[in-house]
Each structure stands twice: as structure tokens, then as C-alpha cells.
Amino acid sequence: MKIYVVATIAWILLQFSAWTTTDAVTSITLDLVNPTAGQYSSFVDKIRNNVKDPNLKYGGTDIAVIGPPSKDKFLRINFQSSRGTVSLGLKRDNLYVVAYLAMDNTNVNRAYYFKSEITSAELTALFPEATTANQKALEYTEDYQSIEKNAQITQGDKSRKELGLGIDLLLTFMEAVNKKARVVKNEARFLLIAIQMTAEVARFRYIQNLVTKNFPNKFDSDNKVIQFEVSWRKISTAIYGDAKNGVFNKDYDFGFGKVRQVKDLQMGLLMYLGKPKSSNEANSTAYATTVL
């Protein structure tokens, strides 16, 4: 009997150890019921502060830098409205989207994910509300071009720019997937807006300032917004390798005019590219324009 009891206790302790070593996923919530510009800015700051390494600084600037990859792989973003919550999953080491969670028209929680970015087990940890049976791999990929194609945008250049940005727009597209039967077009449009209103505003204060300036109204996006969004790696690499005391060693053009002062880019968060370079290394590093 004693042996049985000891074995049972040991098994329980082993299970408890396994449970407690499972990394808790950090959640950050944006309340979309009468939000203010200040509340939205605080929400964006929380994203930056959660993923940055306070000890990392690139190019002699004070711009936040994402920390190196760690065991805490994902960040959960919750959008709350008067009708419920829709959640977005982001990778902590680059803020790329991996999944979203929403109730369907029968009030069942369903998790939809990009299979190249997250496993079923990781998805369960990220969105425990959805059972494995209610997980579905998306039929398209996580890049903007693929999502835009499925969003079926017919205006202008048929890109996400044509949808605009803004808190009111985020709420509109959130409600299109909240407690509704799945419609791929609505889903893709929600993802396009949600990604930009979370990851992109965290990366670029320029975009954040447009949102708060027009808050809470929808506003037309512009080419500069799109150029920023496709240039995060290029900008981060230039600051990392070719800036000293916040000044580039030469003029750079990322698609919206030449810049020499890093501050003119209004950056909010840089990509992790390793340990900061010394001043001598930065001065001797020529930025490769072919970097994607």
C-alpha cells in the first residue's frame, strides 16, 4: 500500500511539474467599447514593452528592439467588444501573425492558424478555449499578398491600402468574424486590419500617430504606410549596421524620400538582429540594399 501511495504521489508531482513548466502566454487586451486615443496608445506601448529587450539599443538610438528568441514564443492580443472577444496570436520574436480565435454562429470557439507558423499543441496553449477538433489550418499563407488575395479587394490597386485603417474599421471587421459563420473574405479583411493595428503600429510610430490623429475614425491609408510595412527589415538593418548616435553614415531612401537622421523615421520597434555593433563596426558596415 505504501509503495502504491508513494508511486501515486510521485506521478501527481510529475504531472504538476509538467503543468507549471508550461509557459503561460501573455495576453494584452484592447477594449473597443468607447476607447480613447490614450487607451489605444497604452495598448500599443504594452505590446512594445512586452517584446522588447531593455538592454538592446541599435545605432546609438533609444528605439526599442525586440528581444532574442526565447521559450516564450507567442503573444495573445484580445479585442473586446460589447458582443464578445476575438483574439489574435503573434510571434514574439517578430510580431508576425500566427492565428486568430473567434466564436462561430453556434457560439463555439474556433481557432484558425497558419500551419507554417504554429503547431497544434502550441495553438492549444495559445487559445485553450478551442479544442483540437475546433482548430483549422488556413488555406492561404501569412504574407500580405496571400491575405489580400483572399480579402477580394476590388478597389484601386486591390491592396490593403484600399481598406483604410482606424479603430472604427477594426471594430467593423472584428464583428464580421465574431459569432458569425466563417466567410474567408471577411476573415482576411479582419486579419489585414488587425495586423496593421497591432504589429505595424508597434513597429512604426508614424502609423500609430495617424491612428491617434484620426481617432477613432477610419482614415485612408497612404503609400508611405505601405512602404514602411514592407521595409521593416531594411530599416532595422540600416540602423543596426550603419548608424551612429542616431545618424546614418549616408542618405537612405526606403521609398518615401531620403533620410539621414534616424529620428525622422519615427520608429517604434526594431527587428532583433543580434548584439549591438561597436562604433567601429557600424562605421565600416555598408548597408546592402538587396536585404529584404
From Swiss-Prot:
Q: Which reaction does it catalyse?
A: Endohydrolysis of the N-glycosidic bond at one specific adenosine on the 28S rRNA
Report the record's disulfide bonds. none
**What are the entry keywords?**
Hydrolase, Plant defense, Protein synthesis inhibitor, Signal, Toxin
One GO MF term on file is: rRNA N-glycosylase activity
One GO BP annotation here? defense response
Annotated active site residues, numbered on this chain, are 200
Q: May I ask which residue range the UniProt record assigns to the signal sequence? A: 1-24
Look up the EC number in the record and give it.
3.2.2.22
The keyword Hydrolase is annotated on this UniProt entry: yes
In terms of InterPro entries, this protein maps to:
Ribosome-inact_prot_sf (IPR036041), Ribosome_inactivat_1/2 (IPR017989), Ribosome_inactivat_prot (IPR001574), Ribosome_inactivat_prot_CS (IPR017988), Ribosome_inactivat_prot_sub1 (IPR016138), Ribosome_inactivat_prot_sub2 (IPR016139)
Please indicate if the UniProt record lists Nucleotide-binding as a keyword.
no
Its top-level enzyme class, in one word, is hydrolase
Say which domain of life the source belongs to.
Answer: Eukaryota
Family, according to the entry, reads as follows: Belongs to the ribosome-inactivating protein family. Type 1 RIP subfamily.
Protein task:
Ribosome-inactivating protein of type 1, inhibits protein synthesis in animal cells. Useful as immunotoxin for pharmacological applications.
Protein's UniProt name:
Ribosome-inactivating protein saporin-2
Task: Tell me which species this is from.
Answer: Saponaria officinalis
